[in-house]
Swiss-Prot record:
Family assignment from sequence similarity: Belongs to the BRE1 family.
Native species: Candida albicans (strain SC5314 / ATCC MYA-2876)
InterPro entries, sorted: E3_ubiquit_lig_Bre1, Znf_RING, Znf_RING/FYVE/PHD
Entry protein name: E3 ubiquitin-protein ligase BRE1
Lineage, top ranks: Eukaryota, Fungi, Dikarya, Ascomycota, Saccharomycotina
PROSITE patterns: ZF_RING_2 (PS50089)
Pathway linked to the protein: Protein modification; protein ubiquitination
Gene: BRE1
Pfam family, one: zf-C3HC4_2
Length: 681
């Protein structure tokens, strides 16, 4: 990535420069001679390139791991969706929860709290256990298989963990080998190694030349070097003695370990024999076995007591239900009889009422007809009397008028009168008669009008009186009916009160019986809970026994593992013996190497010329210039600038960033904090 960035950033410079096609400086290693500054820069760039390749490999491995994890997460999401659909189908089949509860029970993919999952698991297990029938034989079989599978799962997890650790170790070894391989392929390191070999060969050649016989003048110098070499030889012999003593100690430790191993093997064999041939005495001494036996006995006693109580409670409940059914049948029969009697009485009273009403209406109609006839007769008589009175009054009025006009009639007066006077009086009488007739007609019309109005009023009064009589009769009949109904209502209320008292008494009895039934049902529930608890404890004890058996099997397997480990330790012991032999051989080789080194030291001390020292100092300074910072010349180079490839210490780069001098000290190229890369030379 740094090289790509360098290429991208160098494009505008390369376009503007006239010599763009030329190779970049400091990218070729010198083949011969001492190391130059260009070789140092090449070495730095090569180290940065190796580090970048390592980062790239890590990134590729992380990317492949991320793709694998994404696939696994997609598969797990698919499985979770399928399981949620199954749970929805199960809940729909059971149909015992509301929609809110089912939404709480369904799994959420975003969050997976262990407590919430345990609650959901318990709810679903209760639902499924309420619907699914329990088979003890299948349960025992499945529980045994589950225990075996759990044990196998634990073994597999342990093996997986150990394999994972081995894989991590192998990955670390592979990375180290890859680093060593890359370092072995680097040109600079090959160059340095070749220079070292050349120097050693030159030193050996010089020592062989100087080993030839010299004149007596150099005898004193050889004596001095021999004294120094003898001192170094003594030191090396002391170190050899130390190594021998350490080797003897290691041999003694190995012998002790073998003895302990043999004793452990014997103990393990004895324990294995005991485990295969367990006796009752061994189990009786065990506290867990005693507890299990005591718990089993107490549970059996509790189960016997609970069965007796359950049978007695069932018999009592049956008796109470029978008594309750008898009482209900008796009360229902009495209530039905009373209702039938009341219905008969109501029908008879209704029939009597209808009959009385019909007779009453007939009598009222007859009475009205008779009263109307009597009133008509009275009106006719009164009219006749009025007519007579009026005729008499008219006659009296005519006579009075004639007397006033003519006077009392007499023959002498009429005779004395002349004809004209008689005609005149007759005309006056005719006029008066006409006026009297008009007045009579008017009075007759007025009287007739008054008569008609009086007749109408009388008819209205008659109608009103008739209607009043009818209303009075209806009122009185209604009052009579009301009195009869009130009496009947009182009787019915008294009967209803009696029936209500009976119903209250029956309700009280029913409440008492229901309370007793509730108490008995609660006791039954408690007994069932106790029974379930006892069964659960019994199953737990069975499970504990199974777990003990499983533990026994696990112990057998552990014994087998211990035997396998013992075999492996024996193999390791043999390997250690072989390694000790190899070390002894290596010690012999080291002794030979010591002798050769002593000879080399003597030769080197005799031929320690100034020229070789100067060359060594130059090489050391060159290596120091490679490894130490060129700015401060104190700290080791550990950070590289990815823009230009130059390497400095982290302190100098951080000081430059803090002082805002963000340019490379060697090439004056700009950089930022993101362009820094930590390396190890």
């Amino acid at each position: 990535m740094a090289v790509d960035n360098e290429k991208k950033r160098s494009t505008p410079d390369s376009l503007n420069s006239p010599h763009a096609k030329k190779s970049k400086p400091m990218q070729e290693l010198s083949e011969s001679g001492p190391l130059t500054q260009a070789d140092v820069v090449y070495f730095q760039k090569e180290a940065i390139w190796r580090q970048m390749i390592q980062y790239k490999q890590q990134m590729m491995s992380m990317r492949s791991e991320l793709i694998r994890l994404q696939r696994e997460s997609d598969a797990s999401k698919h499985i979770v969706t399928v399981l949620t659909a199954w749970y929805e189908q199960i809940l729909a089949l059971f149909d015992e929860l509301n929609s809110e509860e089912t939404s709480d029970l369904l799994l959420a993919i975003t969050k997976n709290d262990d407590e919430q999952l345990d609650l959901i698991r318990k709810k679903l297990s209760n639902l499924i256990s309420s619907k699914v029938t329990f088979d003890s034989a299948k349960y025992e079989k499945v529980s045994g298989e589950l225990a075996l599978l759990s044990r196998q799962n634990e073994q597999m997890t342990e093996e997986k963990r150990s394999l994972g650790e081995r894989i991590d170790e192998l990955e670390s070894k592979i990375t180290e080998l890859a680093k060593e391989h890359e370092r072995a392929q680097s040109k600079t390191l090959k160059r340095l190694d070749s220079q070292r070999h050349i120097k050693t060969e030159e030193d050996e050649q010089s020592t062989t030349k100087e080993e030839n016989p010299q004149p007596n003048g150099h005898h004193k110098e050889n004596d001095k070097t021999a004294v120094v070499d003898s001192e170094e030889l003594d030191n090396l012999k002391c170190e050899l003695d130390k190594l021998k003593t350490a080797n003897q100690l290691l041999v003694q430790q190995v012998e002790q370990l073998t003895k302990e191993n043999q004793s452990l093997i014997q103990k393990s064999l004895n324990l294995e024999n005991k485990l295969h041939n367990l006796e009752e005495s061994d189990l009786e001494d065990n506290t867990y076995y005693k507890k299990i036996v005591k718990n089993n006995q107490s549970l059996q006693e509790q189960i016997g007591k609970l069965t007796k109580l359950n049978s007695s409670n069932v018999s009592r409940l049956n008796e109470l239900e029978r008594q309750q059914n008898d009482l209900k049948s008796v009360i229902e029969g009495e209530i039905i009889e009373e209702n039938e009697k009341l219905k008969q009485q109501l029908q008879e009273s209704e029939n009597n009422l209808v009959r009385i009403r019909t007779t009453r209406d007939e009598l009222l109609s007859k009475n009205n007809i008779l009263t109307s006839q009597l009133q008509d007769q009275k009106t006719n008589e009164s009219l006749v009397e009025l007519n007579n009175v009026l005729s008499k009054r008219v006659e009296s009025l005519t006579e009075e008028r004639l007397e006033a006009i003519v006077g009392t009639p007499g023959t002498g007066k009429l005779e004395d009168l002349s004809q004209q006077e008689l005609i005149h009086k007759i005309s006056q009488l005719n006029n008066e008669i006409k006026e009297v007739e008009l007045a009579f007609k008017q009075t007759r019309e007025i009287t007739l009008k008054k008569l008609t109005s009086s007749i109408d009023q009388e008819n209205l009064t008659k109608k009103l009186t008739i209607e009043k009589n009818k209303a009075d009769q209806k009122y009185f009949s209604a009052m009579r009916v009301k009195d009869s109904l009130t009496n009947e209502n009182k009787l019915l209320k008294a009967q209803i009160a009696k029936s209500q008292d009976l119903i209250k008494n029956l309700n009280d009895l029913e409440k008492k019986y229901l309370n007793k039934i509730d108490l008995l049902s609660n006791q039954l529930v408690d007994f069932r809970i106790i029974k379930e608890n006892s069964l659960a404890e019994n199953s737990k004890l069975h499970d504990e026994l199974k777990t003990l058996n499983i533990a026994q099997d696990a112990l057998h397997q552990e014994v087998e593992r211990v035997n396998a480990k013992l075999e492996s330790t024996l193999k390791e012991h043999t390997d250690l013996q072989e390694s000790n032999k190899k070390r002894e051989l290596e010690l012999a080789k080291l002794q030979k190497q010591l002798q050769s080194t002593e000879n080399i030291l003597q030769k080197y001390k005799t031929n320690n010329t100034n020229s070789l020292l100067q060359e060594d100092e130059q090489q050391l300074e060159a290596l120091r210039s490679i490894a130490k910072c060129s700015v401060c010349s104190k700290n080791w180079k550990d950070t590289a600038i990815t823009v230009c490839g130059h390497v400095f210490c982290s302190k100098c780069t951080q000081e430059r960033l803090a002082a805002r001098l963000r340019r490379c000290p060697s090439c004056n190229r700009g950089f930022s904090a993101n362009d820094l890369l930590s390396i190890h030379l």
